[in-house]
Amino acid sequence: MYPVDLHMHTIASTHAYSTLHDYIAEAKLKNIKLFAITDHGPDMADAPHYWHFMNMRVWPRLVDGVGILRGIEANIKNLDGDIDCTGPMLDAIDLLIAGFHEPVFPPQDKAANTQAMIATMAQGNVHIISHPGNPKYPVDIKAIAEAAAKYNVALELNNSSFTHSRKGSETNCRAIAEAVRDAGGWLALGSDSHIAYSLGIFEHCERIIAEVNFPQERILNVSPRRLLNFLEQRGRAPIPELAGL
């Protein structure tokens, strides 16, 4: 089991069912050392308000040895790669992941989807692209992986894509892992938990990693320090409270 989970939702996204406290309790049970709460960006119909993200500063950084990152799963909005996390929100966020969601960016053809995803990475704010293997949004996988390596953006293997969501993702996810491996990029693992019990569960991601012989040294979830170093390399200030993780 990896000690870091980078994608989950709380009851602030009203189609999810757990609180921050629930995730802390589950992390302690599973020996998860660091996680990021990444509720949906405000352009989603049931997403938290802008104020929710701005007020995450009241969250403790460390509770009972568990580190907490303030995150968002922003929505890619258009072909220019704009997202619904801008201005002061960017300074309130530790970890910014972004992806396609149908209510905000309806599926388009492969060329358009690829253009939008690469443009999002090129803007320089996003750290991780969420569930890029969604078959509803076909992309040029080689081009996406090479762009991710160029812009130092991780592509996600999303465990939920193999279970409850985005049916038919497995072939794409395997191809993405192979392409990221070949491009020398970063892979991020996300449970995409909508309830705390699935925190830190990456069994399907781990199977793909083994099948394609993906190098552990290019997976952000291997340790809290690796993830924090990545964020610092991307320009985020060090978080003193998490220095000992």
Curated annotation (Swiss-Prot):
Family matches, as CDD domains: PHP_HisPPase_Ycdx_like
Nuclease is among the record's keywords: no
Enzyme class (EC, first level): hydrolase
EC numbers: 3.1.3.-
Cofactor(s) for this UniProt protein: Zn(2+)
GO biological process per UniProt: bacterial-type flagellum-dependent swarming motility
Disulfide links within the chain: none
The keyword Zinc is assigned to this record: yes
Pfam families tied to this protein: PHP
Keywords of this entry: Hydrolase, Metal-binding, Zinc
Sequence positions that bind Zn(2+) 3: 73, 101, 131
One GO CC term on file: cytosol
GO molecular function, one term: zinc ion binding
Assigned protein family: Belongs to the PHP family.
Record-linked NCBIfam families: PRK09248.1
Protein name per UniProt: Probable phosphatase YE2421
Species the sequence originates in: Yersinia enterocolitica serotype O:8 / biotype 1B (strain NCTC 13174 / 8081)
